[in-house]
């Protein structure tokens, strides 16, 4: 079995693959303060809950946009799994033709999503990932990663509104009853939700205009289903796009080793 870790700024998503099947997946908080032992015990409890042991895992791969956490995670893999994990970064084979001015600036999560997106859906392709930041990636009809856009995530914007506006409360991100809010909470929900739907449709439509062939639009991330339910431009919601990409990269980089 292969253990994959997608480390985001807010949450870390973990998955166990048995062949091509994602057997188990979990979401835990990303904490820069945790030690390798704390991460090890957290993961041990998750594995034990589904009847697995550290020894059931034969390979590991990590994608991270939080560099300070990597020391603890790599130590955890070595100490508890006795495995040196693959790290998505310089030196790993991706098969991507990246047209960024500096390819090293492309986040690991965006690379992993692009690998999975091309494999599953072909090209051209637009990938929208609703994470701590909302990222947009454009892959042209030649399967070249052309770049994209990065915007503040929905939760960041909501928290900023709460923090900077004295009379506005912290709210749940949810669909309001009406676009015209009748109270402060519903008005904020309408502004946040439909403001982001407008952002998605505006950016995606402009990216589509650059393509000679209509690109498929894939959304992933925790709030993708909510945004997709209100948007006309998203074709597919794939909640496990990043985990799929990690599995594919693991296979690409270990195939000669059997």
Swiss-Prot record:
The keyword S-adenosyl-L-methionine does not apply. Keywords: ATP-binding, Coenzyme A biosynthesis, Cytoplasm, Kinase, Metal-binding, Nucleotide-binding, Potassium, Transferase. Pathway: Cofactor biosynthesis; coenzyme A biosynthesis; CoA from (R)-pantothenate: step 1/5. It comes from the Bacteria. K(+) binds at residue 129. It is an enzyme of class 2 (transferase). This is Type III pantothenate kinase. The gene is coaX.
């Amino acid at each position: 079995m292969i253990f994959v870790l997608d480390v985001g700024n807010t949450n870390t998503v973990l998955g166990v693959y048995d062949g091509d099947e994602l057997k188990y997946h979990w979401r835990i908080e990303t904490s820069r303060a945790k030690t390798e032992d704390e991460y090890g015990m957290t993961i041990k409890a998750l594995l034990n809950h589904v009847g697995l042991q550290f020894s059931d895992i034969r390979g590991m791969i990590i994608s991270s946009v939080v560099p300070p956490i990597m020391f603890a995670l790599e130590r955890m893999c070595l100490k508890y799994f006795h495995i040196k994990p693959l790290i998505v970064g310089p030196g790993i084979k991706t098969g991507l033709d990246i047209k960024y001015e500096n390819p090293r600036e492309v986040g690991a999560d965006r690379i992993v999503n692009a690998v999975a997106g091309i494999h599953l859906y072909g090209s051209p392709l637009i990938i929208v990932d609703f994470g701590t930041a909302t990222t947009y990636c454009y892959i042209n009809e030649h399967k070249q990663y052309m770049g994209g856009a990065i915007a503040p995530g929905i939760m960041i914007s909501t928290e900023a509104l709460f923090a900077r506006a004295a009379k506005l409360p912290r709210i749940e991100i949810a669909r309001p009853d009406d676009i015209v809010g009748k109270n402060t909470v519903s008005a904020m929900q309408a502004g946040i939700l439909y403001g982001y739907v407008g952002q998605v449709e505006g950016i995606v439509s402009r990216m589509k205009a650059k393509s000679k062939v209509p690109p498929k639009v894939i959304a992933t991330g925790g709030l993708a289903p909510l945004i997709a339910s209100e948007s006309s431009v998203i074709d597919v919601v794939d909640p496990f796009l990043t985990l799929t990409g990690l599995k594919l990269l693991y296979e690409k980089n270990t195939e000669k080793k059997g």
